């Protein structure tokens, strides 16, 4: 059994980035590992495949018809992939196609390492903190004592400070809880109800997951690791402090052996 896989939601305007991601995946990711692209419909899947050198290098998932016109389609695609594959793998990494592998890596081991730490790397964040609080309110968890304490009363943010990895031994229980929320359609339609933040808030509230708050030289509006609009000095500081497996430190990532992926590469222009 292959222990882990990666899910990437894509659509035609992003195909050029997905091709780059796939090429880097084939160059750097140790096998066996399985990569899934999630398409909106059969035509998009076919269009993408026409320009792939090796069509067997990835697997495809295609949204069911009732989901194709949902708002916040990226989140919907991620959930669809997770629900479809939840019984097949131990760990699933989910991220966007504007990413590129830059070093040889064993994703199965990396995903296991991230998931088994049972922590989320966070930083104080002005805008991000409000996003977390807003999601908690929609989940009716905003007064949960564990969440209040772990987030330092909604002052931090953690999405994209590390590769988003789902530990599937928790996912079925989470999925059952999530699908029974009375306002699930509202959550699906809300752009800011990001899939991994919903999942991680649930883990903090109901499982033994913690938030580890990292201090950096600079202040950030959202996640420190994803912030690309800062100086190289600030990016280097973040790379050193967070020691994450991925980064937006486009110019200096080669100086940090832990970094296996650079993301938001569409902003490196």
Segment roles from a protein language model:
Residues 16-17, 44-47, 100-104, 109-110:
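Short catalytic/ligand-binding loop motif for oxyanion handling, primarily in non-cytosolic enzymes
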Residues 23-32:
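Short, acidic, metal-binding catalytic loop of nucleotide-sugar glycosyltransferases
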Residues 102-187:
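Conserved catalytic core of nucleotide-sugar-dependent glycosyltransferases
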Residues 175-269:
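A glycosyltransferase accessory/donor-loop signature
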Residues 1-20:
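N-proximal low-complexity "stem/linker" segments adjacent to membrane-targeting elements
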Residues 32-43:
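Short beta-strand/loop segment that forms part of the nucleotide-sugar
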Residues 88-102:
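Short beta-strand-to-loop acidic/aromatic patch adjacent to the donor-nucleotide binding site
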Residues 44-87:
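Active-site-proximal specificity loops/subdomain of glycosyltransferases
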């Amino acid at each position: 059994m292959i222990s882990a896989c990666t899910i990437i939601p894509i659509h035609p305007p992003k195909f050029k980035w997905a091709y780059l991601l796939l090429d880097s995946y084939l160059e750097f990711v140790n096998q066996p590992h399985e990569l899934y692209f999630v398409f909106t419909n059969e035509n998009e899947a076919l269009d993408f495949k026409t320009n792939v050198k090796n069509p067997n290098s990835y697997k495809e998932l295609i949204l069911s018809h009732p989901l194709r016109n949902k708002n916040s389609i990226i989140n919907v695609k991620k959930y669809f992939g997770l629900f479809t594959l939840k019984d097949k793998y131990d760990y699933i990494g989910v991220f966007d196609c504007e990413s590129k592998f830059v070093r040889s890596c064993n994703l199965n081991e990396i995903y296991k390492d991230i998931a088994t730490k049972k922590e989320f790397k966070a930083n104080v964040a002005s805008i991000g903190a409000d996003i977390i609080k807003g999601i908690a309110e929609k989940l009716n968890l905003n007064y949960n004592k564990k969440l209040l304490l772990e987030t330092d009363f909604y002052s931090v943010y953690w999405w994209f400070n590390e590769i988003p990895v789902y530990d599937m031994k928790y996912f079925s229980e989470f999925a059952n809880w999530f699908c029974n929320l009375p306002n699930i359609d509202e959550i699906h339609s809300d752009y800011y109800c990001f899939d991994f933040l919903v999942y991680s808030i649930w883990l903090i509230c109901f499982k033994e997951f913690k938030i580890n708050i990292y201090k950096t030289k600079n202040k950030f509006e959202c996640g420190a690791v994803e912030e690309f609009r800062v100086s190289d000095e600030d990016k280097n500081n973040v790379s050193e402090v967070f020691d994450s497996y991925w980064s937006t430190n486009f110019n200096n990532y080669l100086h940090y052996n832990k970094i296996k992926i650079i993301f938001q590469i569409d902003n490196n222009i």
